[in-house]
């Protein structure tokens, strides 16, 4: 079951409305009010369809219709309402006083829909601008696209600078790894240098009674202290700079260990005696 036709199609006039027909329709609606559009053609003496009479009155002959071009604020509101309501033109027209759904639909299909489609494809939001800028609505992402285009044009105009920029951006500082092959030994420099003719201070000794034992321990202590003064440095044995021979560091470490063993051996012999 389809919807019943509003009127018979035989003998119905089609095409543009004349001023005489407009006056007859306006006079009838003002006298009888809106509604019952199927009876309007017969009572008004019009050879038109009832639907055609209704649309002619609502879209063109109403006294409260707002004439003129759609303003920029109205364009912005139409775009926002279309995002929420879609193609429900009657609901959109109800929020724009004086505008008809047919006018809004035609304006969207002819002008505004193309701009909104281009803005949605670019991934930006639409902002309605003032008329002195030369455009009614421009996407917010246009500025980013313009900057990208200017940068690419500058690179094409000056290829040498573009190559320099790429090289400087790709240069990364990477420190060279240094391999440490041994332990780090730190020695403290003796702050009291030994003058000529002075004797080394004994590290362990008694009074006047322990002559032989004290003499042997003093000799060992003197040898150890002298070896420490000779081989002492503020820097570690393994500096790792690679400028000198690394065998010198090994020899210095070996001599220190031998002198240390001699000193321990002397201490042990003195305690046992």
Swiss-Prot record:
GO terms for cellular component: nucleus. It is found in: Nucleus. Keywords: Activator, DNA-binding, Nucleus, Repeat, Transcription, Transcription regulation. Changing residue 233 to Q: In allele C1-B73. It holds the Pfam family Myb_DNA-binding. InterPro entries: Homeodomain-like_sf, Myb_dom, Myb_TF_plants, SANT/Myb. Residues 37-61, 89-112 bind DNA. Changing residue 218 to E: In allele C1-B73. Residues 137-164, 196-220 are annotated as: Disordered. Its main location: nucleus. Changing residue 210 to L: In allele C1-B73. SUPFAM superfamilies: Homeodomain-like. Residues 204-214 have a biased composition (Gly residues). GO terms for molecular function: transcription cis-regulatory region binding. One of its GO terms (biological process) is cell differentiation. Residues 9-65, 66-116 form the HTH myb-type domain. According to PubMed:2303027, C1-I allele might be alternatively spliced, giving rise to a much smaller protein. Controls the expression of genes involved in anthocyanin biosynthesis. Regulates the expression of at least 3 structural genes: chalcone synthase, dihydroflavonol reductase and flavonol O(3) glucosyltransferase. C1 acts as a trans-acting factor. This is Anthocyanin regulatory C1 protein. The lineage of its organism: Eukaryota, Viridiplantae, Streptophyta, Embryophyta, Tracheophyta. The gene is C1.
């Amino acid at each position: 079951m389809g919807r019943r036709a509003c009127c018979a199609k035989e003998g119905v006039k089609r095409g543009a409305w004349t001023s005489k027909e407009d006056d007859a329709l306006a006079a009838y609606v003002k006298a009888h009010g809106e509604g019952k559009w199927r009876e309007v053609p017969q009572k008004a003496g019009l050879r038109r369809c009832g639907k055609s009479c209704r649309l002619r009155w609502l879209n063109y002959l109403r006294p409260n219709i707002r004439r003129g071009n759609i303003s920029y604020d109205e364009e912005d509101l139409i775009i926002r309402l279309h995002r929420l309501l879609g193609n429900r033109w009657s609901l959109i027209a109800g929020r724009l006083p004086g505008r008809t759904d047919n006018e809004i639909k035609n304006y969207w299909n002819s002008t505004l829909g193309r701009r909104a489609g281009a803005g949605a494809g670019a991934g930006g939001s639409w902002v309605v601008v003032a008329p002195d800028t030369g455009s009614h609505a421009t996407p917010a992402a246009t500025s980013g696209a313009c900057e990208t285009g200017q940068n690419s044009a500058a690179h094409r105009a000056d290829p040498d600078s573009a190559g320099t920029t790429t090289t400087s951006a790709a240069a990364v500082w990477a420190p060279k790894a240094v391999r440490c092959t041994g332990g780090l030994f730190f020695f403290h420099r003796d702050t009291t240098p030994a003058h000529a003719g002075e004797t080394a201070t004994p590290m362990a000794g008694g009074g006047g009674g322990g002559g032989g034992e004290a003499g042997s321990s003093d000799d060992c202590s003197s040898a150890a202290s002298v070896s420490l003064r000779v081989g002492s440095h503020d820097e570690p044995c393994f500096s790792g700079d690679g400028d000198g021979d690394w065998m010198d560091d090994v020899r210095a470490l070996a001599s220190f260990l031998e002198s240390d063993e001699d000193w321990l051996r002397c201490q042990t012999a003195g305690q046992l005696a």
